[in-house]
Design a protein with these regions (language model features):
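N-terminal glycine-rich flavin-associated loop
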Residues: 81-84
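Glycine-rich loop/turn
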Residues: 34
Length: 379
């Protein structure tokens, strides 16, 4: 086993390096999760950080029973990358910032009627489609900064002369509704495989997965229409879900909470809004539960960010980054909570995965313009 895939007990592992900081509370939460009934193995990713009871940036394998609470309330949250036809050399920061600042958080009903796929036209949560949501969700125009593997880059249909669009969002209120109903009935005890309740949850879960994927498509479409661009999808990968899976000779359930699959083609590991993102080719590995980091991982909790930063920066100053990119976020609390300083370096996470033999880097992307939820604020 790689020196970077580290056993903490018979059932608990982390992907880590000596110079990669992981908060002790997150490790405690890994051990707590490993003690759940029927849990066989848990693996913390390099971006591991504490969550509300269960860690984020981890994968969990159980047999005979699965745990919706491990997946959490944003079922299907993930990353979608699009190759746009926006010429990098013609990109005008002022013009694009103005156009995207005029984009409402929620799509208009007339737009939904014209653009929604027929399968979602009558969905009870249809009004949320095309909306980014709060927290760490975002859409970001990016520029190819470095091509590391030219062959894989070309095979993916990527183009360094044009900008990319990255969308990070999930199932919006759908997943929250599913989890609330589940917890009200079953608390955190999980569901026995094959039971009526388990089958019902999986059906709702799969609907949320599909909803999240379409939501990312609709977000990308709204943004590209707003800036008069077109594009084509490169990848779409969820990092919050549960699925039937065989690990070794055991058939069971693989939960991913902030963990990117390594067995579904190219993935992107994003940094904070002031950091690079990395397109990588996974190298499948059963020991790590076929999972990788889903981002850089937080260093600071949300509640401490403004206290740490407000004396040094105004919200306006935080709308510009050290890489020269711009941030559209009228929610003054959120712009502090999601500051680049609150996150680890994406490169440290990526290098840990490289050293563990789990990925092949393909390209590095630099942020150009990041769009966040306005929190209902108007410019």
């Amino acid at each position: 086993m790689s020196n970077y895939i580290r056993p903490l007990s018979d059932a608990v592992f982390t992907i880590a390096s000596d110079d990669l900081w992981i908060e002790s509370l997150a490790i405690q939460q890994l051990h707590t999760t490993a003690n759940l009934p029927n849990m066989q193995r848990v693996v913390g990713m390099p971006d591991l950080h504490p969550g509300r009871g269960y860690p984020i940036g981890a994968a969990f394998f159980s047999v005979g029973r699965f745990y919706p609470a491990l997946v959490g309330n944003d079922i299907g949250c993930g990353m979608a990358l699009w190759q746009t036809d926006i010429l990098t050399r013609k990109y005008n920061a002022d013009k694009f910032e103005k156009r995207l600042s005029d984009l409402d958080d929620v799509a208009e009903e007339s737009w939904l009627e014209e653009n929604l796929p027929s399968a979602f036209a009558q969905h009870p949560w249809r009004s949320s489609l095309g909306s980014i949501g709060g927290g760490n969700h975002f859409a970001e125009l990016q520029q190819v900064d470095q091509i590391i593997n030219a062959e894989l880059f070309a095979l993916a249909g990527l183009d360094a002369q044009h900008l990319q669009l990255l969308v990070h969002s999930g199932s919006r209120g759908v997943g929250q509704s599913i989890l609330q109903r589940h917890i009200a009935s079953f608390s955190h005890h999980g569901l026995p495989q094959g039971s009526d309740d388990a089958l019902r949850y999986i059906a709702e879960h799969d609907d949320a997965l599909a909803f999240a994927c379409i939501n990312r498509q609709m977000i990308a479409l709204r943004i590209m229409q707003q800036v008069k661009a077109t594009g084509s999808p490169v990848l779409d990968v969820a990092h919050n879900f549960v699925s039937a899976c065989q690990i070794g000779d055991q058939q069971g359930w693989l939960h991913r909470k902030g963990a990117t699959p390594d067995d579904n083609g190219l993935v992107i590991i994003p940094g904070s809004r002031g950091d690079y993102s990395w397109i990588v080719q996974p190298v499948a590995n059963e020991k790590t539960l076929h999972s990788l980091a889903h981002g850089a991982g937080r260093k600071w909790g949300r509640t401490e960010c403004k206290g740490r930063l407000a004396a040094k920066y105004t919200a306006t100053q935080l709308s510009r980054t050290e890489l020269g990119s711009r941030v559209i976020c009228r929610d003054k609390q959120l712009i502090f909570e999601e500051a680049p300083q609150a996150y680890k370096s994406a490169e440290s996470v990526v290098q840990c995965l490289v050293q563990a033999g789990l990925i092949i880097p393909v390209a590095r992307l630099r942020p150009v313009l990041t769009l966040k939820n306005s929190g209902g604020k108007k410019g």
